[in-house]
Amino acid sequence: KELVRWKYQRYIKDYLRCIASVDDNVGRMLDYLKETGLTKNTVVIYCSDQGFYLGEHGWFDKRWIYEESLRTPFLVHWPSVTKPGTVNNDIVSPIDFASTFLEVAGAKVPNDIQGRSLVPLLKGNTPKDWRTTFYYHYYEFPGWHDVRRHYGVTDGRYKLIRFYEPDVNEWELYDLKTDPHEMQSVYGRSQYASIQAGLKKELNRQRR
């Protein structure tokens, strides 16, 4: 009971305090840039390494492939390049950051670096060959958090997941348009057969 109380009270309260502190201090930094006249010559990028559960699905923390954890904050303020209030729905990844920072700074991007620069996307010119799926794999089990090993792939509209522990062999498929909170798996339903087969093919490709 004490652990449960800590997880759902102290831990989440600490997390929310952290968010409030970050918000306050990002604001202070933006105010400083404005006051010193540096705003027009500074690119501000805010991101995180993962999302977080605040009770969704009955969970806290991260790790699972569901949307609340899989999606991460990524905000960019680049005067004369990004338009305030615009949203880009392309699939990006932290592996793209290094290439992006190098290009923004005017440095050469090595040919063998992982990821691709996000600069074209920030300018509103998404390359035709930009990725259309995202692969995720969680393998840290057993552990105190008791999150089972699983992997999956999403194209932004649909998400296919497989839990593969020796005592678990389960698949889940979600239609994120009709079920954005991922409450009802549609895996095995005939109307999703082609979607399911296509995502399995893509999952196998990504895992090679």
Where are these regions (language model features)?
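Long, internal low-complexity/basic segments
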Residues: 1-10, 18, 22, 93, ...
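A long, amphipathic alpha-helix that forms part
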Residues: 2-42
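Histidine-centered active-site microenvironments of extracellular/periplasmic hydrolases
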Residues: 31-86, 93, 144
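Generic structural signal for alpha-helix termini and adjacent loop/cap motifs
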Residues: 32, 36, 104-107, 124, ...
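Short, polar/flexible loop-turn hinges at active-site or ligand-entry regions and domain interfaces
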Residues: 82-87, 107-109, 190
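Beta-strand elements within well-structured catalytic alpha/beta cores of enzymes
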Residues: 15, 19-22, 26, 43-48, ...
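C-terminal cap/loop subdomain of S1 sulfatases and analogous C-terminal strand-loop tails that border
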Residues: 50-56, 95-98, 103-176, 181, ...
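Short, solvent-exposed loop/helix junctions and linker helices
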Residues: 16, 69, 88-91, 95, ...
